[in-house]
Amino acid sequence: LPAVALALLTGCAAPRNSVTQIGVIDALLAGAYDGQTKCGTLLREGDTGLGTFDRLDGEMILLDGQLYQVRADGKVCSPTPETTTPFAVVTQFRPALSCELNGGITFREFQKRMDALLPNTNVVCAFRLTGTFRQMKTRSVPAQSKPYVPLLEATRHQSVFELGSCRGTVVGFRMPDFVKGINVPGYHAHFLTADRQAGGHVLEFTLEEGTLELAICSQIDLRLPTDGDSLKGIDFSRDRRMELDKAEK
């Protein structure tokens, strides 16, 4: 049976974590793919996180202060500091809890187990899961051309990668329902193999064994476009939750 071992990390008090977010998810869903913030700027705000790139060109993983770009052809690249992003979520990762997991845990089961470790489901939580996976299924999306189509349509042309048995790290955030329209409620995770040769947006996995680290975040710093045109014409009164579920999961 799957086993769990939980430990408080050393220290008298839980470290304070904050999240820096570039853009809003409903704008991305509507097709606002033009990059607004340079990766060099993003790296000053966090060492762990996820997102996408200008024109929706692949999946972003920020791990140990290094940025990686998983493109639709499966190649992993290192973006330049001048590369831009329309949407990203990063944090200076200082975990307060460490949890050992084993026994063939699926992504869905993992979410239930992690929820049980949280003080409640209305907190913002960053997490890292490093270990060996029996199977890992990820995706990436090709760069888009104007006029941009909505994200749901763009993901119909996504590349899906069945990585099989591998070692690596899942980086993600668990957001409360009250972020609807701004971020992704629930779980949003990206993956990078230990050899930095494959990864992407997590669709499914089965974990053999690994270490989960959790950081509760008490602040969100939201950075919005200042050019005046990026969000122009987007209907933010529209409920896009169904689109989000289909595009992200």
Task: Report residues per predicted region.
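Bacterial N-terminal signal peptides that target proteins for export
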Residues: 1-2
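N-terminal low-complexity or amphipathic/hydrophobic leaders
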Residues: 24-89
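A glycine-rich, hydrophobic loop/mini-helix early in the fold
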Residues: 70-117
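Histidine-centered divalent-metal-coordination microenvironment in nucleic-acid enzymes
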Residues: 184-192
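A hydrophobic, small-residue-rich beta->alpha segment in the mid-to-C-terminal subdomain
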Residues: 193-235
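Long, positively charged binding patches that form subdomain-scale interaction surfaces
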Residues: 108-173, 180-182
